[in-house]
Each structure stands twice: as C-alpha cells, then as structure tokens.
Amino acid sequence: MRQTKTGILLANLGTPDAPTSEAVKRYLKQFLSDRRVVDTPRLLWWPLLRGVILPLRSPRVAKLYQSIWMDGGSPLMVYSREQQQALAARLPDTPVALGMSYGSPSLESAVDELLASDVDHIVVLPLYPQYSCSTVGAVWDELGRILARKRRIPGISFIRDYADDGAYIDALAKSARESFARHGEPDVLLLSYHGIPQRYADEGDDYPQRCRDTTRELVSALGLPPEKVMMTFQSRFGREPWLTPYTDETLKMLGEKGTGHIQVMCPGFAADCLETLEEIAEQNREIFLEAGGKKYAYIPALNATPEHIDMMLKLTAPYR
C-alpha cells in the first residue's frame, strides 16, 4: 500500500505587493469584494466601493504602508515567509506552502505548489487563532472554489482555529512575560483583537466567544488578576456597530483616568502587519499618551518565534 504524502498549507489574509496607491487599490478591491468580508447587497456596495472607498482610501493606506515597509516587503509577507521557511526546516519531508486569501501568493498557487509536489493530502492551517466567518470562512470558501476546478482532489484536513490550544497560549504567555521583564509589569495588559461587525456575531459567528476563550486561558497562564487585563476590538470599518469595547476609545479612557503604564498585545494576529505595527504601535500609542498616559509598549506578534513554530508542529501533527 502506497504511503500517503502530506503537505501543509499556511493561510493568511494577504497584503499589497507594494506601498503604492495602485497596489493598495488592487488589494483592497479584492479584499472588500469578498462577501465574507462585506455582505452589503452588491447593487449598493459596488458603486460605493469603486466610486468612493477605493479612490479615497488607497492613497491614505499606501502612506501608512510606506511607514512600516521592510526591505523584504510588507511585514506580513516577510514574517509569513519566515514562518513557512522555519516550519519547512523542521519538517524536511513535508512540503509547506504559503497562500493568501487576497493578493499573492494566492491560495490557488499554494494548492498548485503542493499538488506539484505529488501530495495526496493537504493540512490547511489558517493562521487566525480565533475563528471568524470573515477570515477562516473565507479560506474555506476559496479552497472549495479552487478544488472545484481540479480533476485530482487531495484529501483535506482543515484546522478551524486554535483559540485555546495549550501551545498557542504558552507562546503568548512567554511573549508577554518577556515584555514584562523588559518594560516592567503594566498597570493594565490590554488584549486587542481585530473587530467584526456586531451583526455577524448576532447571526452566529462565534468569534467573540473564541476571543474570550483566548483571553481567559492567557490570563490564567500569566497568573494576573482579572482587573489587570482588558479585552478590546480594533480596526473597525464603516458605520455599522462593531464588537465593543473599541481599542482606541478604551486607551483614551484609560489615559484620562490616570492609568500610567499600558502594554498591548494582539493575540489574533499571527504575524505583525499594518494593523499592529501602525495602528496599535503608533496611532493608539499617541492616543493613550495624549490622553494622559505615561508608558505604552506594544508586545510583538508571535511571528516566526520558535514557540510559534512549535505550535504549528503540534497543531498539524495529528494529520501528518
């Protein structure tokens, strides 16, 4: 009997190819055209997206990308490639591919790369610790569309999420402790997760609960009193209500009431990107300090740390 050959597909959101208005416009058009991300009726959404949002947001977002761009490209791509390479180095007999829901390398190119390596089985690991229809659901949908066009379909194992996985929590706790050792223990550890529209949660998306699961386990692992940890949501977009409390408003409130030392961790981001390096590490730092806060530190994402790669090994082990 022929032994099954397994490959691993690491999936993430994606990034513009360059910090330019045109590249950002292409990326945002693909991203904001996904019904999993924005489910506004198309007759209403297309004119708004193409006539207002893309022309206005693309130049502004491009400038933000320029402020964090690295020699090797966008931070998300640099760190994602490092994750892929580090995992592949630990699994020399297992092909590891990287695919993005939007932009390049695409999920389809990652599937094709693995099939070209003659794999019979693909383990799909979306690098979103907390499930949401707008992230993990989008990977699932695109994977189905890709495979629907193939004559040869491999076996698929799909890891839905890992919000309360022990190795993930341990990696976060180690990162937080290292930050505490460097900057001192904060008055408040703020855990900022990417937001989603409140309506998505009302309609059944269990993302808020999975964020609470991560927060509960991390607080326990760190041994912090609950009153020293807050959970908030960032990166809201549009006018409808999103999950609350909002990160920026919470930081302003904490600064105004005299909280001196804040450290912020973003447990939902597997790799640093625009939303962490610019929005959290820069914009929200200014909000807190201008409101009266004294000390602010951003705790980096897990990126390609050994503990993060150990977690990927553990999560994929049952399927290899």
Curated annotation (Swiss-Prot):
Keywords: Cytoplasm, Heme biosynthesis, Iron, Lyase, Metal-binding, Porphyrin biosynthesis. It is found in: Cytoplasm. One of its GO terms (molecular function) is ferrochelatase activity. Gene3D superfamilies: 3.40.50.1400. It catalyses: heme b + 2 H(+) = protoporphyrin IX + Fe(2+). Pathway: Porphyrin-containing compound metabolism; protoheme biosynthesis; protoheme from protoporphyrin-IX: step 1/1. PROSITE patterns: FERROCHELATASE. Its EC number is 4.98.1.1. NCBIfam families: hemH. Catalyzes the ferrous insertion into protoporphyrin IX. Monomer. This is Ferrochelatase. The gene is hemH.
